[in-house]
Every structure is written in structure tokens, then in C-alpha cells.
Amino acid sequence: MNKLSLIPAATVLMIRDIDDGMEVLMVKRSKKPPFENLFVFPGGKIDEADKDINISNLCDGLNDQEASKKLGLSHGGLSYWVACVRECFEEVGILFAKKSNGEDLDLTGFEKEKYDNYRDRLISNEINLYDICIEEDLKLTMLNIAPFSHWITPNIETKRFDTRFFIAHLPNNQIEKHDGTAVSYTHLTLPTKA
């Protein structure tokens, strides 16, 4: 296997507790490849900005050395967690972050419009996650995201991903909403029906 051709990626299973157990968030990809019209979990490839040393300084509870160790890497592990946060915010509007003073984000109230605007600008590459964190005095909540699997796309595929899978609890006071670009539909479902 030629590891040089593998594209590093992160995928997140977001769960929430319900009376009968738990639900997991699924998304339907848009008609754009890869994975057009498929139901998947939010995620995508690691961007260069996910590797930026500046964003690593805003990661609460985890540094690159610890993250890399958890993934069995020599370095660069934290970029997978950052990609999880960024992809979730871009694709479904969920932001794994808190105010620097420890206060939870409430993206259902008076700040919803402001964060919707940040999200639109992030998707269109007018701003990056680091800029949002600095502007709003945020820390990314890395301890809410845990790795649990590692898959590599089979050799038969033309585009191959080296994907780390993570699990995270959906934060309170945030409602998932598809972006209309990469994702055309979001759905919370029981894992047995996923």
C-alpha cells in the first residue's frame, strides 16, 4: 500500500442521550463527489489550517503530543481533533467550543445569527476557525471528542482516505442544521437504524 497517496481525514459520530438510549447524527451528502447522496457521518479531509500552531494554542485539554500518542502517530494528531471541530461547524453548525471563561456557547439564542454568519464565512474560506476563536474568545473543547476507530479506503478506490473516526456528545444549546452545500440533510437516528 502506498501511504503517500492516502488523504488524512476525520469523521465524527455525534451522539445525544434520549430516554431509550441514544441517537447518532447522520448527514446526507450533496450530489457532489465523493460520497454523493450517501448517508454518512460529518467529516472530511484535514486542511492545512487544521495543522496551524496558532489554533493548537486554543485547544482546551489536549496538545499535539497527547493527541498524537492517542492515534499512534509521531506528530500531527491534534490536527484530526481540529478538523473534527471545523467539519462539524461547517457541515452541521455544531461548534465544539466554550468561551475562555468556561461559559457554554448558546447557538440557539441571541448569538445564533452571528455564528451562522461565521459559519457561512468559514465555508466560503473568508475566515478560518482560528479567527473565529480569537474574535469570540473561544477555546475548542477537545476532551469532548474521543477517537475510536481507524479506517483506510480500499485499494480499489481512486481517491483513498486515511480516516480517523471519533465520537462526541452533542453540546447543549446547539441545533444541527445542514449547510446546503456539502450536506443536504441531517437526521438524528437510533444507531440500530443507521
Stretch-by-stretch model annotation:
Residues T186-A194:
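Conserved small/polar residues in nucleotide/adenosyl-binding loops
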Residues M1-L4, S30, P154-E157:
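Short Gly/Pro-enriched turn/cap motifs at secondary-structure boundaries
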Residues E111-K112, Y118-S184:
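Glycine- and acidic-residue-rich phosphate-binding/metal-coordinating active-site segment common to enzymes
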Residues M14-R16, M26-K28, I167-H169:
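Short, well-ordered beta-strand micro-motif
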Residues F41-G43, A49-T141:
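The catalytic Nudix box helix
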Residues L4-V24, P33, L38-D52:
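Conserved N-terminal beta-strand and adjoining loop/helix that marks the start
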Residues K31-P33, I46-D47, I152-T153, N172-N173:
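Short, solvent-exposed loop/turn segments at secondary-structure junctions
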Residues N2-A9, D17, K28, D52-S56, ...:
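Macromolecular interaction modules
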